[in-house]
């Protein structure tokens, strides 16, 4: 007799697993993490093993997936597409190998090991070398006919190569979406207003279930073959590795990571290696599949109800787990972006304790409907910040209310605003907001910006909180005394400890002044009262007496190194400086493009936003962001302060000649984004007046008489009726004229001395950085490449050049030393 509780539990587990199967396999909308599904399946499997009468024919332990969706016709698999048993620990893998060695009598059998892709399993059927049908796994016995969609995948051969294939061949494999392609697709989807894909796995599954193959063809899907189903008798195999080799020969892509390993040690070593590189792979994997390589051994091992005994999936630690949202807080970034963050009940995800996860923005919270108190699925992959990916609404407690963005910044109290059509809310406090100042400074000193080594996040927070540093320019006024004072206070865990440590550096009246500072900030020196929470910050904000630092009692080398690093950063390149400013939408690539095109900070900081569209790959949104930044008096003052403190651009140069075509009147009209003014209409309007201010004087009748269509003519005249637009047009024309006057003559532009030449730089240059040298060479037409080849025109070799110099010698590539480079640059900078 089966006890009631196990029977009820088994029924509940079956119901929940079947519901999860339906959402996962049919709707492509997973409701629970894979780890939760695996736990429930193992629990049900254990119950059915203990009480065999509980097992039912439709139990999830007996079947692979769910019944097929009704949108596609059914395909019955000639050879069932079975699932694999899972191993979650090394002992389970050892037991898997032990069973095989005991049955086959081999001490170290060979296994085929390969990553387990997180995609959609499919079966491809070929007759006489021609692809005739493709189907999903479905429930393992019956799948969905997705032939038309699979034909759109370029990685699936429509006709097999060579002539050794069997007359009938079923190939099993995985359709997946590479992560870079997934991210690129979503970027385009957002720009075009399409629905974004939730994750690569859902993207692959949903793409194959599109009723319109044209939609599938737009999705970046790939395929790897990993086995076979039905095969005609005219071809036979002896091992799984032989099967994979044949599949490659017939034109199927097979994972290059497949390896033949031996015994349990080989399996676990492979697992460790793949676990190490997992997050660097261009596709998602959730474990490793081990298959006994010898086919006769596979036959002898046989099957259990739902899986082969000769194969197993060794799963990685789960990258998704469920937990509870305890609070939703707002973090303020360097550009003022207000990012909601979920504070979570601590949970282990991929081996790391996660206590918070990003919610990205308010729209994402609304889409997921995340509420405080909800049970959510949290995902963490590699170094990626943990994120909430789904809400388990069935577990929502009663009475929880929808979340809304607060109207005030939690740091400075300024209004939080959102521009029309934008996804991001921002604190309007700008540099008056301490949170934005901290993030702006952290970005400014980062390695790819001004590269100030030794100034960490904690130090930046203390410098800002203590009002020692108000902006990035203040870094260049930091003194050894200020930094040592900072270290002395922060190392002291209590006021008493601070006074004790201070005796090594100050005595007499100055020591009494320090005691008075502590009393002023609320510290009871008798030790009986409570210590104020922020006493260290308050002490640092006070006016200190002079200290005679005893260098034997306090470390000073770190402070000296930091001041030296700050001093070195005064000499920088234009692209580094622009990137360091932290303008919205301006990353390294955009900063480099701006520096290459305009060449001079004095030019860039005066330009109106439309002229930034002259730079390749900069559109209206980015151009407006740069223009807005440069139009703010506080930002111009910050640049002035940096220049005043000795920051110098070492690679300034005239604007590039390629700007000329972007500075015509027709181009300026396009850049202004006036409604109804198409590129063709802009060319027409440019024939009516030589400059923007003169074109602004044309009235509607004059435009109509000149043949300009009514909608365009009316839109233009209405646009010029705005005083702000008139002012913008005049400023734009003036800056355009200034740029044109500074451009190289057309003759010189066509005779760049390094046009078409590939140049490699290696080693350290004494007179300028390699970045600066590369920029100067690019201005003269060179293409800078990273490796030496026969096509390399010349190699610039500084100190400690390394292997590139050896390769250049071997290939007889021309080699320039620094003196020759400087002579060349000086020769052409003078022209």
Swiss-Prot record:
Similarity annotation: Belongs to the NAD-dependent DNA ligase family. LigA subfamily.
Chain's role: DNA ligase that catalyzes the formation of phosphodiester linkages between 5'-phosphoryl and 3'-hydroxyl groups in double-stranded DNA using NAD as a coenzyme and as the energy source for the reaction. It is essential for DNA replication and repair of damaged DNA.
InterPro entries listed in its UniProt record: BRCT_dom, BRCT_dom_sf, DisA/LigA_HHH, DNA_ligase, DNA_ligase_AS, DNAligase_adenylation, DNAligase_N, NA-bd_OB-fold
Matches recorded under Gene3D superfamilies: 5' to 3' exonuclease, C-terminal subdomain, 6.20.10.30, BRCT domain, DNA ligase/mRNA capping enzyme, Helix hairpin bin, Nucleic acid-binding proteins
NCBIfam families from the UniProt entry: dnlj, PRK07956.1
E.C. no: 6.5.1.2
Name the UniProt record assigns to this protein: DNA ligase
Pfam families documented for this protein: BRCT (PF00533), DNA_ligase_aden (PF01653), DNA_ligase_OB (PF03120), DNA_ligase_ZBD (PF03119), HHH_2 (PF12826), Nlig-Ia (PF22745)
Top-rank taxon: Bacteria
Residues at which NAD(+) binds: 34-38, 83-84, 114, 137, 174, 291, 315
Annotated active site: 116 (n6-amp-lysine intermediate)
Residues annotated as binding Zn(2+): 409, 412, 427, 433
Organism annotation: Xylella fastidiosa (strain M12)
PROSITE patterns: BRCT (PS50172), DNA_LIGASE_N1 (PS01055)
Coiled coil residues, start to end: none
Catalysed reaction equations from the record: NAD(+) + (deoxyribonucleotide)n-3'-hydroxyl + 5'-phospho-(deoxyribonucleotide)m = (deoxyribonucleotide)n+m + AMP + beta-nicotinamide D-nucleotide
Gene Ontology CC: cytosol
GO biological process: DNA repair; DNA replication
GO MF annotations in UniProt: DNA ligase (NAD+) activity; metal ion binding
Classification via PANTHER family: CHROMOSOME TRANSMISSION FIDELITY FACTOR 18, DNA LIGASE
Domain (BRCT): residue spans on this chain: 749-831
Cofactor: Mg(2+); Mn(2+)
Keywords attached to this entry: DNA damage, DNA repair, DNA replication, Ligase, Magnesium, Manganese, Metal-binding, NAD, Zinc
